[in-house]
């Protein structure tokens, strides 16, 4: 369930951030900020649903998912193919995410 929450959180975070990017860098109208802010609020709420006692650990584990999702956004929305360094970096981050999520706690 955690990965599903992280996946949806990534969609809302990236979408919300892209709304600001589009307004400031692509000349989209200011009203793009409204759905961007709603999207970012949904992102933050979703992270509170992750079963964890520590916010920092939740955010750190989410980071790898965010990176992978951002590269998918790069490819599918911005029509730019991630290069081998993008893919390699994402794999390293996902390995770190797995260690954080599944490491023994004592």
From Swiss-Prot:
SUPFAM superfamilies: Multidrug resistance efflux transporter EmrE (SSF103481). Belongs to the UPF0060 family. Keywords: Cell inner membrane, Cell membrane, Membrane, Transmembrane, Transmembrane helix. It comes from the Bacteria. The lineage of its organism: Bacteria, Pseudomonadati, Pseudomonadota, Alphaproteobacteria, Hyphomicrobiales. This is UPF0060 membrane protein Rleg2_1018. It is found in: Cell inner membrane. It comes from Rhizobium leguminosarum bv. trifolii (strain WSM2304). The chain crosses the membrane at residues 4-24, 30-50, 58-78, 86-106. It is a multi-pass membrane protein. One of its GO terms (cellular component) is plasma membrane. It holds the Pfam family UPF0060.
């Amino acid at each position: 369930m955690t990965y599903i929450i992280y996946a949806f959180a990534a969609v809302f975070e990236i979408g919300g951030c892209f709304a600001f990017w589009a307004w400031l860098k692509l000349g989209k109208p200011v009203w793009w900020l409204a759905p961007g802010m709603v999207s970012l609020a949904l992102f933050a709420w979703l992270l509170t649903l992750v079963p964890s006692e520590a916010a920092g650990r939740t955010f750190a584990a989410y980071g790898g998912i965010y990176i992978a999702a951002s590269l998918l956004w790069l490819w599918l929305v911005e029509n730019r193919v991630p290069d081998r360094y993008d893919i390699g970096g994402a794999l390293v981050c996902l390995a770190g995410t797995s260690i954080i999520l599944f490491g023994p706690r004592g």
